[in-house]
Amino acid sequence: MSDLHLTRGGCPIWETNTMEHFNRSIDVIRGMKDIDAIVVTGDISNDGSEWTYKYADRLFSSLGIPTFCCPGNHDSLKVMLEEYNPSFFKVLPQSCIIDGWNLILLNSVIQDDEDPNQNKARGFLSEASLNYMIQKLEEGFPSIIALHHPPLEPGGWLNRKLLDNRDDFNKIISLYDNVKLVIYGHIHYFTNVLKGHVRYCSSSSVGFAFDKDLPKFQIADGYEGINLIEIINDSITINNIQLSFRSN
């Protein structure tokens, strides 16, 4: 899942109750069987408040499913990675082996030069992050890479504020046949593309969805959702599950 955009006290944003949407996603997952892990590709919070991380941590804990999170541009790196110590979900730096697959989480967030408490909308993977990824890929396990910013253009007006050094990222992973899947968020839109030996997939937002074919920043009501990723041997199947919220 991605882009929860929780706010302190559950205050609506974009005329949307994102907390209600997150609660719904938790209920949907609770009804599933045999879930090995939950991966959140950024923007747990919309305002960076500790309240939002505590709330997410409590609901993820109620599921009892291992949960891994990387930051998004709306998250507070200071709160998420330094000040708040979640009791359940795991944050960067992090990689883990899940049933023989290596899950590698990366930080693509760029802090604002003028205000370190704010982040830029576009993304960038530091040399340290790329080297960390290479180190983990050298271990040879079939691998899933998770980050917030898209390394591929999704089309339409969503072709903006992507991963700045996506060419470098894509060139590196093209050299490693064990990279099977790259998952990300930020665009609030579901995509599923096979490029060479790598499948690229973005998750529609839990908070509020967009659509490349709609006007810029128009909410795509009813398309909020999560992705169910099923891996059997080397076969990867991804289903986008909509949370079924629509305006009256």
Which residues does each predicted region cover?
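Acidic/histidine-rich helix-loop elements
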Residues: 2-20, 46, 77-90, 111-125, ...
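Active-site-proximal beta-strand elements of phosphoester/diester hydrolases
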Residues: 1-8, 100-114, 144-146, 198-204, ...
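His/acidic metal-ligating clusters that form di-metal
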Residues: 25-38, 119-199, 236-237
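Active-site metal-binding loops of divalent metal-dependent hydrolases
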Residues: 2-5, 42-44, 73-74, 108-109, ...
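Metal-dependent catalytic neighborhoods of phosphoester/phosphodiester hydrolases
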Residues: 40-61, 76-91, 156-158, 191-196
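Binuclear metal-dependent phosphoesterase catalytic core
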Residues: 13-16, 172-174, 191-248
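N-terminal active-site segment of His-dependent metallophosphoesterases
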Residues: 1-55, 138, 154
